[in-house]
């Protein structure tokens, strides 16, 4: 929302008619309606492709649903005609439509559980596992307080959508959590029987091994058995020989990363625990990221280094210098501008920029097995109040990167008895594991976390503590000939104000969802 409001000339964060959702839905429905007419295709292939098309419809409906709530339910294609209108369905009707499509797809014998080795060149196609997993993800969102509560998410006028149950169920329904849990049980029962999918594990129990495993889990397309659904950038033409990669996002002078659009905050950095799984404490930490600023001695959760660029990380031919005046951060943080405005940089999916991504086939995970374990954990907690069971599922995700037992690492939080505290840890774990994978914003909206939306965010100013001043150490302008490599730093948290977010001082719960265009 621009300047705290939205009007008919503005685009919301997800355009109702501008994200190719309806085009994809129509194309998929058109395929389902006509595939049987294809004369030279085997019947098994027809049924498989029709099932995949149904998953496409459900996935695109879900993309809209988590932004708008109840939607018009299109179940057939329309010919060109002067006008046609469909009413907006309730939240319950919209969820049921998506789930029925996924159930129909999963029940199709010709839809394979996995792509296997024979179909690895078809990465991105939907499978039975994808259909069952997406069902869990949809039910998790539907069961959450945004739609499933005794009070509507917004009480500001007009209230037509509230009265018509188009933005909530009308009351709290605990059975929705039961449905989510059952969907998870069904998925993992099938996984135990069918196999194939697994968390990408480290080949060696070292910091590098754990980081490499996480990198492969979210970043690698080929031979990735953790991916249930992957998506790719849709862009016409090529830039710099990048196949299906959005050049403007990465490298242009006004690109998103270059101008600081994805710059991590101090609050996000603090979510990542120490390398043993214990919470990170900024106020008592001597070193924040590496022992003595040596990138061969990391001390934090390996996922941190794959998610954000931090001071001291190996960065091309040198250790990243993100202190004020450093080689990589001459004045970004001081002026709160550019890709290091907060004292950190975006690393996940961006890596080291244009040269590191050149000629890569890149994908964003839409659903990974790691997320399935975290969905299962949340469903166990909310449906059965099974705290030990929930912790067990979270630990499977943490163990992949070498972190210890969640409850043992947080003895003061009483995670085996305090359900609210455990939920906070599950949401934090989701933020760390699934950062930049289109999850955190929706975790905040589905739990109606006005406190987090209003929370002032911070950056971190870093200063050399060796007498070398606000200057680079390495590179042509560095003073490495005079000073040894800096090992200690002074840190100063500062509020982010360039610009300040409108909702910090003027939040409205209506912003949990996006606005429909006035023409609709």
Language-model segments: residues:
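Short coil/turn linking the two alpha-helices of tandem helical-hairpin repeats
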Residues: 65-66, 72, 138-150, 382-385
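Carboxylate/His-rich catalytic cores and anion/metal-binding grooves
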Residues: 57-61, 306-307, 311-335
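Short coil/linker segments at helix-helix boundaries
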Residues: 70-88, 146-179
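Conserved, well-structured interaction surfaces
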Residues: 1-68, 82-123, 293, 298, ...
